[in-house]
Amino acid sequence: MSDNITKLSPAKINLYLEVLERTSSGFHNIESLMTFCDFGDIINIKKEKSFRFTIDGPFSKNLSLDNNIINKSVSFVEKLLNKNITVHINLTKNLPISSGMGGGSSNAATVILCLIEMYKLDCKEDFHQSLFSLGADIPFCFFRKSALVTGKGENVLEIENDYENFFVLLINPMIEISTKKIFEKLTIPTRKDFTPFNEKFLCNTKIINFLNSRNNDLEKEAISQCEEIKNILDVLKNETNSLLSRMTGSGSTCFALFRNKEDLINAEKIFTKKFKTFWVKTTKIVNSFETL
């Protein structure tokens, strides 16, 4: 049993996110092609005599130690083990809060993954489904592979693809947006010409055309709450060589895909010059991380 585990808790991006319907229970059924970046928060877990949870990093200041999804994740694993967990969990928070990059969900999933590895827990077949009770993005974040996510987030289908060589620019205006408010005010679009997802779109020559034909249905409502999102997207579309530019999740982070590093760096320079208070990060798509 390893007594000290450190893992990247990667940022996720929704390459597209379409809301198909609102269910009678108040949830929303979606279709989203989701992937990861090679940047994110860092989770370190060490065996100790009692439980401790600490947070550091550039975005640690406004995070609560008590009301945090990591504590819920620990309780989730304790129920599976039927014993108390005595570890020190340290979260290094590198991602902005409430940014649409799945930070909290990725943190929770990574903690669960580390604890399963540390305690050599044998997961049951329905384990992935039970993760949904912690949060809609957690099944995908635990899966740690590019996937088509449907239903309310509980259905995660691995996608074989060859677009890992895309470079990514992430931009956040440092304005938090409430996912709950976005969905409460969302008007679900009517789709006359809906193109079902097909894996044949996933080669480099076709994926960009396919993605540009899809949307993030949360973008319009997010812009009504944060006009800076529109400003970011306008610059990405009109002043850079981006292949795709879009908001991820419920915002306020936007991303753009680039074919080469030169275009990526040029776009980064534009944003650091125009928007000095924004968070800007260069990274790459990663199709999969180590899992169980």
Kindly label every feature range from the protein language model.
Residues 99-126, 140:
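DPxDG-like acidic metal-binding loop motif
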Residues 53, 143, 148-244, 259-272, ...:
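Conserved, helical-rich catalytic subdomain that frames metal- and/or nucleotide-binding sites
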